[in-house]
Amino acid sequence: MQPKYKIYATLLDSYFNYLNSDVIYERYYGWSENPPCTEEEFQQKQFQELIDRINRKPFDSEVADKGTAFNEVIDCMIENRKSETVQVEKIYSDIGNGEQKVIALKAVYNNRSFVFPISLCREFANYYKEALTQQRVEAILPTAYGNVLVYGLIDELMPTSVHDIKTTGSYTCLLY
């Protein structure tokens, strides 16, 4: 069953955002007296982002880098290994009597530094301690347009669930 198309989740998100650009624009900017762009400009931006995704054009995003760094820190803790892509350092606090304790982890990725509280890192690592990390998955789906290969990476694969780790307090579209 040879696929006619190959699609991944972020590409589907970009396509959805383009198709629904009028609704998204209204939700985020419809109330504004001085929106940053017109609805037509917003639609054109969504179209260009879709084209850039199709062409896999690299993009620079501090928010995405923070998520990548955090995910790698957690995966390293789960797998008890050192990272090959993120430089990680412990941040200490004096607790008296010449003793120190780790209070955070500093992660450097793409020349950007991020600090994650050790309590948060431990909470995530403990929760996902039995997970399989960064699992590539794919499936061929028959559609009216031919067979489609849908593929992607799972951050954390648990026995009965799939988890996509985010470093934002509220995940919504168009965040980065």
PLM region descriptions:
Residues 70-71, 152-173:
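Conserved catalytic cores of phosphodiester-cleaving nucleases, focusing on short active-site segments
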Residues 1-153:
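Metal-dependent nuclease catalytic cores that hydrolyze phosphodiester bonds in DNA/RNA
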Residues 176:
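Conserved small/polar residues in nucleotide/adenosyl-binding loops
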